[in-house]
Structure formats: C-alpha cells, structure tokens
Amino acid sequence: ELNEVNVVSRRMGTMKLRSSVMNEEMISSAELSRAACCNLGESFVTNPSVDVSYSDAATGAKQIKLLGLSGTYVQMLTENIPNYRGAASPYGLGYVPGPWMQSIQVSKGISSVKNGYEAITGQINVEFKKPQLPEADWVSANLFASSTNRYEANADATLKLSKRWSTSLLAHYENETKAHDGNDDGFVDIPQVEQYNVWNRWAYMGDHYVFQAGFKALSESRTSGQAHHTDMQTGDLYKVGIDTERYEFFTKNAYIFNKEKNTNLALILSASWHNQDAMYGRKLYNVDQTNVYASLMFETEFNKQNSFSAGLSFNYDAYDQHYRLENQTELPLIKAFAKEAVPGAYAQY
C-alpha cells in the first residue's frame, strides 16, 4: 500500500529569468525578508548582483552601480513607471520601505524601451504589494529597533470590497535622530533621519478592463554635520539640514482584447511633486520639481517566443530653484527655472 506523498518546494530568493531576452534577475520577498529592516537601498546587502554605495556619506545620499557605472546611468522604476528622477534621485533609495516591496527586477545592460530611454547600464524595477492578489495580507505590521537608536514601524491593510474592487493602505515611520560620532572627530558618522510615508492604492480587475491607481505622501527631515567642536573654536557649527516633502499619483488603465495572446491597450499616467529645502552650512539650495509622465502602449504575443509592443510616451520635468552658493548670508537667493519636455515613440519585437 502506497501512503500519501507530499512534495514541497521553496522558491529561491534570487532567480535568473531565463524566459527574458534581457539579462534580468528577480529578487523575491523571500530574499528581501532576510534583512531585519531595510529600504530599497539596503535591500541589496544580501545580494551581490547590485552594488550600492554612498555618493555623499555626510547626507546619506546613495547610488546604484551596474556594469561599473552609477547614478544617472541606472534607471529607477516603480511598477514599470519611471520614478525618483532629478531632485529625488540622491535619496530616492530611502523612500521605498522594505516591507512594502513584493519583488525587485534587476536588468543589466540593454533594457526594454517600453519604460523610457534613460537606461544606459540597466534598470531597477520595484513591484509593491498589490491588493488584488489572492495572497495579499488583510493586515500586517512589524516593528524594528536597534542598539544605535534606530526605530521603524510598518503597517499595511488590504480590503476586498467586492470580487473586482480592492484597496490597500500602507504606512511607514522611521526615526534615527540620535547623533553618532564613533571616531570623535566632531562630525556625525551617519545623518539623522525622521520619515513619514503613507500610500493608498486601489485596483479594479474586470474581465476585459483593468484599473489601478495610487496616491503616496512622504515627509522627511535629514540632518548632519558637526555635533561639537574638537578644539577651542567657538564659531558656529557646520550643519546640514534637508527637509523634503513629496507627493505621487499614478493610474494604470488597460483593455484586454485577447487574454490568451495577451493582446491589450494600456494607458499609464503618473505625476509627482517634490519639494526640497536644503542647508549646507550657510549655503542654501531649495528646489520644487514637478514631473508628469504618460505612456500609451499596445502589446500582443504571437507565441511564447515572439511578442510585439509599440507605443507613445511623454515626459515633462519642471525645476523651480532658489539657491545661494556663497557663505555670505546677506546675499540674495539666485532664482533659476528649467523645464524639459520629451515626447517619444517606440516599437519593440
């Protein structure tokens, strides 16, 4: 008599996507959970495929390096929408809490043109928890505390309103406001950060029409610089202070003509407003950045090995800057305004 046999497998934390024509890897939630606390910038600590380094240790600015090049050569995406560009790029890796992420896709080298033209050495795409998925948590929370006085709190709740409608609310709080000066040189070793982050998203999953939308709000205060004098100096301490407010909105609309061939027409819209007031000693740099992105896309699959996509895209950035790069506080602020509008069209087979 043959008894019952259970075959159990566990999905690997990092997988090479062999079905993709690009050099693409996926970091799943199993790999992300190995870090007790993390944001996007810290989630690659357990994974050697991506190198994250400080571009400015005094303020905590980080950058991702792929194929030996870093910074603007790597395109950041959130659910395949270009994000954290311009003024948000130095600290954007800290704007994505780890518990919010479902997976990360890392593409090295030439990437798909569907998401823009800015990927020179690769793309980093973050997929968040989605309320429409069957495995979505109804409610979850986690707390973190460290010996360095870093505290984090994360919570998310999902509500299935009907068979087709669902919504989720995600919240994050981070506090690391104690100054650390391990080598006693008078300067803090890491910036002191306090961050509030809230995101509400909605989803409608119809037979042919699919809709997603979300709104995100972030407030962050970041301080660094001198903690005390190391000699008999009595002058003002050199302080760095960066206050940020950021708001994002996105919507995805898709009409599916043929599910078997994945034939669909999609419209993606997103907008963000980023306000940053920065002080570096007596120098000031304040910037308001407005971004609008739109993409109209058609896709179809002929078979498992052949697919076609074509579309139109538009990206608009506006920067309103006020700055003083001299140490004389009596000097007026310099005003500068810049904008960039980039329309585009593409086809990919």
Q: Can you describe what each PLM-predicted range is?
A:
Residues 5-35, 63:
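N-terminal periplasmic "start-of-domain" segments of outer-membrane beta-barrel proteins
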Residues 24, 41-82:
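Extracytoplasmic beta-strand/coil segments of soluble accessory domains associated
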Residues 40-43, 62-65, 77, 92-97, ...:
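N-terminal periplasmic accessory domains that precede
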Residues 63, 81-109, 198:
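Short acidic/polar hinge/loop motifs at secondary-structure boundaries
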Residues 75, 103-107, 123-129, 138-147, ...:
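Predominantly transmembrane beta-strands of Gram-negative outer membrane beta-barrel pores used
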Residues 141-145, 169-175, 213-217, 267-273, ...:
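Transmembrane beta-barrel strands of outer-membrane/channel proteins
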Residues 176-197, 205-265, 271-289:
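Flexible loop and strand-edge segments within Gram-negative outer membrane beta-barrel domains
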Residues 238-259, 265, 273-349:
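Outer-membrane beta-barrel transmembrane domain signature of Gram-negative proteins
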